[in-house]
Amino acid sequence: MKKKHDGIVYETKEVLNPSPKVTHCCKSLWLKYSFQKAYMTQLVSSQPVPAMSRNPDHNLLSQPKEHSIVQKHHQEEIIHKLAMQLRHIGDNIDHRMVREDLQQDGRDALDHFVFFFFRRVQVLLHFFWNNHLL
């Protein structure tokens, strides 16, 4: 039986029973992102992360619920601190780039003035030389 949702036509049995290729793709994506999540958790956590199961059906809540809530809150605080540090670093880089742009604008104006001044001196000397005033 075919159904249509937002312009996408699909077989309901295909949604309920995905092909082995789709299942393998989903499992490999789950595996990839679960290891990335474990690595990020290890970066922000002071506690070591337990080894991840390769089975996506495995229950990840092996720790007591209270401990995991406290640990999650601690991790959120650390992530917030890291985000604020990254924001501060980004702001510093932005301010430095603005300052360098202003300095570059000042140098460009000075270069233009020096070029203009020496060009006028050269024209004046050329005038005196041609009229035998020197």
Curated annotation (Swiss-Prot):
Residue numbers covered by motif Microbody targeting signal: 131-134
Residues annotated as transmembrane: none
Record GO cellular component, one term: peroxisome
One Pfam family, short name: PXT1
InterPro entries, A to Z: PXT1 (IPR029186)
Subcellular location: Peroxisome
Keywords linked to the UniProt accession: Peroxisome
Predominant cellular place of this UniProt entry's protein: other
Taxonomic superkingdom: Eukaryota
Protein name: Peroxisomal testis-specific protein 1
